[in-house]
Amino acid sequence: MEFIVSCINRGSRFAYCVNLGERITIKKVDITCSPGEVIEIDDYSKPVPEGSRRKFSDKALRLPAIETPIKIGITDADEITKRMWPKIEAAAMLIARKVLLSIPVIIRFHNDADGSSGAVALHRALRAMLESKMSTERLNIRWIMNKGVSYGTSEAAADKLWISNYDCIEKPLMIFIDFGTSVDSNQGVAYMGDSTEIVWLDHHPIEDGFCGKGLEHYINPWLFGGDSSYTAGLLSCILSKAISNLDTSIMEDASLIGDHSRYARFSDDGVAISTILDMITSDPEIVKTSNQITPAEIERILESKKRREELLHYARIRSEEAMAAASKSLRKHQLPGAKAFISDFKKVRKDGTKYPLPGRFASMLFDRLSASEQEPCILMLHFGSYISIRMDARLNAKVGMRSLIAEEKRRHEEVISSGGGHDLALSIKLKDESDKEMIIRDILMLVTERLGKGKDANDQNT
């Protein structure tokens, strides 16, 4: 039998070999091999005979065939996919290569329905690819649910420490799904340096100065004539199809629904799975004791019809309780031709619960408000040092909320830590939560000015 020694775990002295479904324990069998060698052995539990090694040749590796084009039946989205296809194809080939070579891979995905649906699709694709090679899932693929919206130095330091355990035939691989397109990620990327290769799948608007834009495998629909409605989860599903040609339609639906995409297809399964993903990524303790959750664990939950029904019932109860509490505590501002609503999340969610998360509840509440109001709406929901903003597209066309937040950051550099997001869904992080009422008033003033009226809105309780 012939195996490529792809990497060696320094701490525990495991050798990971291509086409071998198990690890060779170096301490047990006195194997003195190094990454990049091809070894020929009849029994991997015995020492490697002399003269059985040779250098790895690139030609020995067969990558999965990738056929084009991949379509989902949504004309605009399919056109964007077509424009992104060379980048998607290259990223899929790179991911397949690293996994088949057993190179260490870290996959970070955002903790919401969009990020987790993309992670589940990729998990299924990699599992199918490995099974087609009659191999087990590699133990050196690490899945991390990323709670923040950026990739900071603390995350990078943890990743670099894990990667440092390995001597590899090639550079390890980092994959980011649905987060990180921010200048706040620059330090994390710089910290990693050239120690890894990176595949970055995102759909957030690209901030000026964001260094990830220049990476070879950074893929974002904004660079190809698209926008945030082409979600990161959808992008990950398309890439996953390229790897293993699986049906990812339900995860596509869950992603599009979860991120309020205009491409959303409201299938029953899509709505149910989007709700479940949203809940268990908001509060992993609902399904386990750890604050982390992996795609494999998500799949075990989704496979149980009884568990799915229990979680959906719980989600409906918690959402309605939160909605009722929010309705009682809303403040309303009358703007010129529009309405603004302010919600204090402390008055919404019960103590000790994590679902719904503030940002996701802001979207739920805004949908309810905009459906009941004839005038365009803006909602600002505040929680701790954060302000989550949702806005009607008609209002945004007049106001330009992303540029308004950029102006607000320039005006209050000493107060605002960070801010940004999509056109209609943004957030601001403050250095001190005591400043949030001042920032909310200032945003209302700027919105009013941009609507062509130079007066502050009149605050009143609903």
Regions found by a protein language model. Name each.
Residues 341-462:
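Glycine-rich, acidic loop segments that terminate in or are immediately followed by a histidine
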Residues 13, 44-53:
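Short, Lys/Arg- and Gly-enriched loop/turn segments at beta-strand edges
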Residues 199-200, 204-219, 403-414:
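Flexible glycine/proline-rich, aromatic-decorated loop/lid segments
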Residues 1-11, 38-41:
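Structural detector for short beta-strands of small beta-barrel domains
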Residues 35, 53-108, 115-116, 124, ...:
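An N-terminal, well-structured beta->alpha segment
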Residues 100-107, 111-113, 208-352, 363-372, ...:
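A structured phosphate/pyrophosphate-recognition subdomain
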